[in-house]
């Protein structure tokens, strides 16, 4: 394993935090967003997500987006980006299931899952071939199966 940073990215309700928890369990640690282990830092949403979410919310500052992309490209040898996705109907069902459970204002916002999914796909088309970007369909595989795949690929140890 030679990566220092693992960024978990993807639409809302695509399984990023659940995967983060599974990675933590793999390392026998408590769950934590951005949990730092002795040799890697796992970040639940960071630069890749910032680019996608700025596009989604129409708040793109071109110079900032360019700088974020350049940072990702400059550090591609030290980073793995894990894109979790699910079909739009599954994302919408997960959103309905979650809505209001934690009482936060966030869950009162209805996210257009199709638009968000399209933005992530667009960003993948732009950057995917130049980055270490792993893609996992959380409809088809469990967090534990994803962790196992990451171990087999040498991304996790």
Residue ranges and their predicted role:
Residues 8:
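Hydrophobic anchor at the beta1->P-loop junction of P-loop NTPases
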Residues 11-14, 18-59:
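Conserved substrate/cofactor phosphate-moiety recognition/catalytic segment
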């Amino acid at each position: 394993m030679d990566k220092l940073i693992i960024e978990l990215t993807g639409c809302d309700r695509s399984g990023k935090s659940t995967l983060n928890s599974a990675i933590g369990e793999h390392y026998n640690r408590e769950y934590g967003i951005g949990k730092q282990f002795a040799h890697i830092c796992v970040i639940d949403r960071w630069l890749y997500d910032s680019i996608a979410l700025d596009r989604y919310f129409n708040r793109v500052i071109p110079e900032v987006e360019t700088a974020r992309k350049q940072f990702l490209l400059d550090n591609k040898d030290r980073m793995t980006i894990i894109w979790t996705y699910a079909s739009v109907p599954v994302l919408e069902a997960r959103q309905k299931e979650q809505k209001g459970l934690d009482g936060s204002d966030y869950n009162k916002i209805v996210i257009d899952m199709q638009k968000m999914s399209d933005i992530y796909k667009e960003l993948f088309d732009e950057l995917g071939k130049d980055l270490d970007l792993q893609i996992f369909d959380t409809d088809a595989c469990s967090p534990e199966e994803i962790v196992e795949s990451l171990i087999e690929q040498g991304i996790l140890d």
